[in-house]
């Protein structure tokens, strides 16, 4: 029975994470890039100003309270989404890509990330546009909803949209227990045991208690934790990695040469027949890139749709920034750490000194920090992997809510918390392989929806740019549902009136001050 399941899983995994699935992912990103006129390139200043730049200039981006009492801030949604995507793939996954595909794999990770920015943009635009309120007054959005109300609204596609939505939700729930929970916890427990000799059970119980306190408190509590955890963990790892790269600054030019040359080297990473090198570097770069940033999987949409935001494009731009931060920043820094410290052959990517690929980054940090190196990586993986658990707890919750309603989410959360100990103390084997497949299976219905609704994404984006950039006075496209659209417009009108009153009051105070002085 186990052998049969393993064989079937291997076949399915070879499709979703093989040439067919990766080609679909690549083509979707390319198609959305073309249809939006290269938004991630032409509007780079705009989306930077309205995402990370707005954190320091716009209080609405970080505001925790508004009339949407059950919503979370845009910054919180971004941190929770990054919590779900930044994980072991940013450390171990990069090392695997380099060893298996050569340094050139990093170039193809960048390509997948750049195109994936528009896939992420599109799915988040659709997530906000098709979201709806649940019985608690929370926003619920994600691929399930734009499959049902978007794809399902097209002629003859009602049943197809519903079936794909149910399949997506089922795959998401199963993946949340594996890649979103047990495999991350297993990685944490293994690294804590190796670095600090902490027993697996102790790590599991401790993390189970912490997870229960956070996850059972709902999205607000998860977002409150990730809002603080993600910036801290990113800064901690990036600073340590940058120190290593600076110490080996003389090797940086050679590292970039190896990346670009390896991307187009016909016989890189193991030699073989003509074109083998490009095939390997491209395949591993695409695969690890997709696994790292999750663009196209539809996972992060479920938390981004819960944000306190009216504009679908605003949340879409956060999706672009999330891919930029995950792959272009964190994965690139990890790659430079590996390539500049000499733990791999910089030309071929083959491991030196008999170091296993999953310990490459630790070896690089050991070369710079001595015995503290493995401890640094253990702490980094603790942050990265555990933040993934928190992010995926919300994804699974929303999938269960779609299928069974609010009552089902309570049962799910209890099971999710219990799985933490299982992940810490058991060898996962087939369970991990299955969850990897379920993770990939989420991608298929989501990408089909993005492609089918690409025209809607283009319309919403054009509407936004016409209003915000070109200054046209036209009705906004905020929601597909008339009742939500009207409510948002009424709230926007009220906010505009309050802003005018505040401005008038400020002018009166200034005039009054002048009168007193005279």
Q: Which residues does each predicted region cover?
A:
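N-terminal alpha-helical transmembrane segments of multi-pass membrane transport
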Residues: 1-84, 88, 99-105, 116, ...
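Transmembrane helix-loop junctions in multi-pass membrane proteins
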Residues: 4-5, 35-40, 90-94, 176-189, ...
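Membrane-interface loop-to-helix entry segments
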Residues: 24-49, 164, 168, 185-192, ...
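Helix-loop-helix module between adjacent transmembrane segments
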Residues: 32-33, 112-137, 148-186, 190-214, ...
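Flexible loop linkers connecting adjacent transmembrane helices
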Residues: 38-72, 96-106, 110, 118-159, ...
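Alpha-helical membrane segments and immediately flanking helix-loop junctions
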Residues: 59-98, 126-129, 135-151, 173, ...
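Selective recognition of specific alpha-helical transmembrane segments in multi-pass small-molecule
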Residues: 115-123, 204-219, 230-250, 283, ...
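Extracellular/periplasmic helix-exit of transmembrane alpha-helices
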Residues: 123-136, 242-258, 266, 270-276, ...
């Amino acid at each position: 029975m186990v052998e049969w399941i393993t064989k079937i899983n291997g076949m399915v995994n070879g499709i979703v994470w093989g040439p067919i699935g990766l080609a679909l992912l690549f083509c979707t990103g390319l198609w959305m890039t073309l249809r939006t006129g290269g938004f991630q390139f032409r509007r780079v200043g705009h989306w930077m100003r309205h995402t990370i730049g707005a954190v320091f200039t716009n209080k609405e981006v970080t505001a925790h309270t508004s009339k949407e009492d059950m919503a979370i801030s845009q910054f919180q949604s971004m941190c929770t989404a990054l919590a779900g995507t930044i994980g072991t793939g940013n450390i171990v996954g990069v090392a695997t890509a380099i060893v298996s595909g050569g340094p050139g794999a990093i170039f193809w990770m960048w390509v997948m990330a750049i195109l994936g920015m528009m896939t992420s943009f599109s799915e988040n635009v659709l997530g906000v546009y098709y979201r709806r309120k649940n019985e608690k007054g929370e926003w619920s959005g994600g691929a399930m909803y734009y499959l049902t109300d978007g794809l399902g609204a097209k002629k003859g596609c009602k049943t197809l949209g519903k079936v794909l939505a149910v399949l997506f939700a089922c795959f998401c729930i199963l993946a949340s227990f594996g890649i979103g929970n047990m495999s991350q916890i297993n990685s944490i427990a293994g690294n804590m045991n190796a670095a600090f000799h902490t027993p697996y059970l102790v790590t599991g119980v401790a993390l189970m208690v912490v997870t229960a306190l956070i996850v059972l408190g709902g999205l607000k509590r998860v977002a409150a934790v990730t809002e603080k955890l993600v910036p801290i963990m990113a800064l901690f790892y990036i600073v340590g990695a940058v120190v290593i790269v600076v110490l080996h600054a003389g090797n940086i030019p050679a590292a970039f040469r190896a990346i670009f040359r390896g991307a187009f080297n016909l016989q890189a990473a193991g030699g073989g027949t003509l074109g083998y090198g490009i095939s390997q570097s491209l395949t591993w770069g695409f695969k690890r890139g997709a696994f790292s940033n999750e663009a196209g999987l539809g996972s992060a949409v479920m938390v981004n749709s819960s944000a306190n935001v009216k504009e679908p494009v605003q949340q879409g731009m956060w999706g672009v920034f999330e891919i930029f931060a995950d792959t272009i920043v964190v994965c690139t820094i990890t790659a430079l750490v590996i390539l500049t410290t000499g733990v791999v052959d910089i030309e071929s990517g083959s491991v030196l000194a008999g170091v296993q690929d999953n310990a490459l980054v630790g070896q690089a940090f050991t070369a710079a920090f001595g015995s503290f190196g493995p401890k640094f990586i253990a702490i980094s993986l603790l942050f990265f992997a555990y933040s993934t658990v928190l992010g995926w707890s919300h994804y699974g919750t929303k999938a269960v809510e779609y299928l069974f309603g609010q009552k089902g989410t309570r049962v799910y959360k209890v099971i999710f918390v219990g799985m933490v100990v299982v992940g810490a103390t058991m060898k996962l084997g087939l369970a991990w392989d299955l969850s990897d497949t379920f993770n990939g299976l989420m991608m298929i219905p989501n990408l089909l929806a993005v492609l089918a609704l690409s025209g809607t994404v283009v319309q919403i984006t054009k509407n936004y740019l016409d209003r915000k950039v070109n200054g046209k006075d036209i009705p906004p496209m905020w929601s597909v549902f008339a009742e939500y659209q009207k409510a948002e417009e009424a709230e926007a009108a009220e906010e505009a009136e309050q802003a005018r009153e505040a401005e008038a009051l400020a002018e009166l105070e200034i005039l009054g001050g002048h009168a007193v002085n005279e």
